[in-house]
Amino acid sequence: MNNNTESFELIECHLEKIIFDENSDYVVGLNIREEIYGLKLNSYDGTILTFVDSGCAENPHINIIHQILLQFKKSVGFELQRVIIEAKYGDVFYCRLHWSHEKQDIYNVCSLGDALILQALSECDMFVVDFVFKQLDKFDEDGFMSNFEDYT
């Protein structure tokens, strides 16, 4: 019998920073256990996340696809309860969306970028699995982050 259930402990986290460099790379800083950890995002997801995090998505003239998804889910009775960063393979993160409904809950797997955007829009809880947390690199402003600009 496998006795490593602590590897699947959920650790609460939240978005602390969005960093952009001149090479169109983004890094998000997640606050986990009072320390900041850096996770890379592609330029599209980073741009949309910045749009949401800056408040521009609160009253847009055109909704982004993530807003349309949340509106549709709400219209059929689902609410995003939490986002879980649950797996990491190489530099790819897999996240699980937990949607609640009065009759049943459903779960979807998505990319880190989509999960962060949906979490920022819905303001639901966000967690990282301990197994993934142990693979993350601390946000090092003196090291690999020296070429990035902070836009938060």
What kind of region is each of these model predictions?
Residues 2-152:
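Divalent-cation
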